[in-house]
C-alpha cells in the first residue's frame, strides 16, 4: 500500500493538469505554429513557463486504483501486475484466465 500522502498528491496533480490543460494546449499550439511572430512565440513561452510545474501531464503518475502502487501498472486494467494476478485468480476479470500450453 502506497503512502496516503503520495496518493493524495497525485490526485491533486491530476486536478491541476485538468485545470490548465486547455490553456496549455493553446500556448503549445502558438509556439509550434511556424506562422507565429517571434514576439508572440516568446510571450507564449513565458506564459507557459509561469504556469505551475504540476500543470504538466508528465508529472502525473499512473497508480493502482486499489492500493496506489506506482510500479507495474497495467493500463488496460487500471491496476498493478500484483493486483491483476490476484483478481484473475479469483475470476474477477472477465475473459482473463491462466494460460497453459
UniProtKB/Swiss-Prot annotation:
Disulphide bonds in the chain: none
Lineage, broadest ranks: Bacteria, Bacillati, Actinomycetota, Actinomycetes, Mycobacteriales
Gene3D superfamilies hit by this protein: 1.10.287.1480
Stated family: Belongs to the universal ribosomal protein uS14 family.
Keywords: Ribonucleoprotein, Ribosomal protein, RNA-binding, rRNA-binding
Region (Disordered): 46-72
Biased composition (Basic and acidic residues): 61-70
Keyword rRNA-binding: yes
Species whose genome carries this gene: Corynebacterium diphtheriae (strain ATCC 700971 / NCTC 13129 / Biotype gravis)
This protein's encoding gene: rpsN
Protein's name according to its UniProt entry: Small ribosomal subunit protein uS14
An MF annotation (GO) of this entry: structural constituent of ribosome
Subunit structure: Part of the 30S ribosomal subunit. Contacts proteins S3 and S10.
Gene Ontology cellular component list: small ribosomal subunit
